[in-house]
Amino acid sequence: MKFSSHFCEGHLPIAFVFSAPGEEEKRKGKPVAGESGANLEAALVHLHSAQPTLFSSLHRYDYRITNSFAEPIAVALGHGKSEADNREIQKPQNVQRVLSELEGCNLVILCGNKAKVLSQAIRESGKTIIEVPHIGNKGLNSKFKIPNQIRSASSFDRRQYRIKLWAEAILQAIARENAT
């Protein structure tokens, strides 16, 4: 299986597209190597439980994973930012790279605003796309509010609740796609 800080070939025809690899991904040489990856694996438990035929594995690296920008970007790496600019993402050679890396995938899940910059190009390539927030803790916290009865739960339990909501958002979007 092919790995780099921004790409995992996987063997299932579902792809997850994130923004850009960071310091952790550069160090480990695999995409979504930190908390986002742990959150993705927790979400796969929910996705597999609800749609075991579609999400047939609980392991993130069984799926295609790429990023809207290939080069690691992080403040910890000396950059003043942690994501590429939209102009960088939309450069023809970058769009072509992403489309090439998505070859063989029918369903593409765009995780976060930077991944969504590629939605038109990916949709025009004939793939089904689902758009959800980034599964990093910041993305989960900003998008999925928790009800009052869960506010006193541990931070781990609140995170698990938000991860379940993220997985449900994917399942609802798939159901809407299938209804059309």
Regions found by a protein language model. Name each.
Residues 2-62, 135-137:
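Adenosine ribonucleotide-centric catalytic and binding domains
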Residues 11-12, 104-106, 126:
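A general structural motif
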Residues 20-24, 70-73, 114-117, 134-138:
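Short, solvent-exposed loop/turn segments at secondary-structure junctions
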Residues 26-29, 75-77, 118-122, 142:
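A short acidic (Asp/Glu
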Residues 47-50, 58, 98-106, 173-179:
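A structural motif corresponding to the C-terminal end of an alpha-helix
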Residues 80-93, 120-180:
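C-terminal capping/extension of enzyme domains
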